[in-house]
Amino acid sequence: VTPGSNPKTGSVKADNSSKYAAEGLPLNNLGSVNIEKVDKVLFKYAIMLDIPVEYLSNQAGLFEFIEDWYGTPYKYGGNDRKGIDCSGFSSTLMSNVFAITVPRTSKDQYQNCQKVSKSELKEGDLVFFNIRGRGVSHVGVYLTNNKFVHASVNAGVVISDLGEGYYSTKFMGGGRPKK
């Protein structure tokens, strides 16, 4: 039994802390959730993103897509589950989950977005990085709570945090894809 849980029903009271309100998360719809009825994929990603599972209930397609690709190895120029690069992953995700077509390269994706500040990032925005010191050279898709999904050269498709030392120093900005 954990704090806030009801041992008879297995439900857990959602944490309505101000950090979720600051993210614009729909606190008015949060309440109790029966853990046994929660989709395992959503539960997994709620833990990874450090947010209440209720927030993910309307985004099942996004997290099922991420789950299907998670761990896919990085391959420069790749565009399938045998290997994919960062811009291939972001364009595939945007097309399949959000029905938005974005260009194939990270540089072109950056040039074809409405720029947004880090504090304005919303789920589905693109996040851009200057990895090589020559402008945009890496892209990911923003999720929530400072987390983004991307195809990392070292780890393949993973979720990372914009606050991590490496990514915080390489972050160039965010972009909202034009529909």
Q: What do the predicted segments below correspond to?
A:
Residues 1-10, 136, 143-179:
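Aromatic- and glycine-rich peptidoglycan recognition patches
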Residues 72-123:
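Catalytic cysteine-centered active-site loop
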Residues 124-125, 146:
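Structural motif
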